[in-house]
Amino acid sequence: MDLQLAGKKALVTGSYRGTGRMIALALAAEGAHVGVHGFEREAAEAVAREIHEQGGAAVALEGDILTDDGAKQLLRETQDALGDADILVNNYGTADAGSWMKSETPDWIDAYQKNVLSAVRITRGLMEGMKAKGWGRIINLGTIGSTEPAARMPHYYAAKGAMATMTISLAKELESTGVTVNLVSPGLIRTKEVEERFIARGKKKGWGETWEEVEPHVLKEFMGNLTGHVPRPEEIADVVVFVASPRAGAINALNIRVDGGTTALVT
């Protein structure tokens, strides 16, 4: 299937590593010109080079989107390198450890800054250009914790819950403009960091020393699903790329859970 993304211009925040990197690679593989964002240019340049080596088009962009000035820098660099963006993937966010009694007021504010305002700044900077063109895609990266939050990390789940409601509000704001807004919500993702963390835990618990040995225990004791494997970053990226494409014009104001069936709910 041709996703009709050739020549589309996409900015992916936090695409210097992890799932964001895979989203940038996948968009470029479909012909999009990708802005790879990092808080430090060197990290973004490494991913941009990787895209170039695979025959794709990419440019490294820098900006501390946790500040207004840093977000303005990223928006300026995006405009200079790409022109008006067609696609924005608000991928950046962090899940810092905490609990109801250990997470203090600054932790809650920090979670909102990282997971909500970072996206708001860039969204507000790009949405008018999309409206003017009559076409655009804004995709926010959420979490299944917005649907079924855990007791741990309440500050993080509260912030991601705000991103979920923000997505619907923005979709209504952009009604009939040709710009769609959706939320893609993964559960546990098999990133390099997740593999390393659970392999280390598995060695202590006697589960084994490889991911193949440890994964069944992760699914049983930490976060199970109906597929029998922990979703890979590539699987999240594939969904994001489809939603970003012209083929997905009827998908709007939706929370798409990509968790292998961890949250097996009718909603």
Located regions from the model:
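Conserved glycine-rich cofactor-binding loop
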Residues: 16-17, 40
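Short C-terminal tail/terminal secondary-structure segment
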Residues: 18, 148, 240-241, 252-267
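Active-site helix of classical SDR
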Residues: 123, 159
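Alpha-helical segment proximal to the catalytic Tyr-Lys
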Residues: 128, 172-173, 249
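Short, small/polar-rich loop/turn modules that mediate ligand/substrate recognition or access, typified
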Residues: 175, 180, 251-253
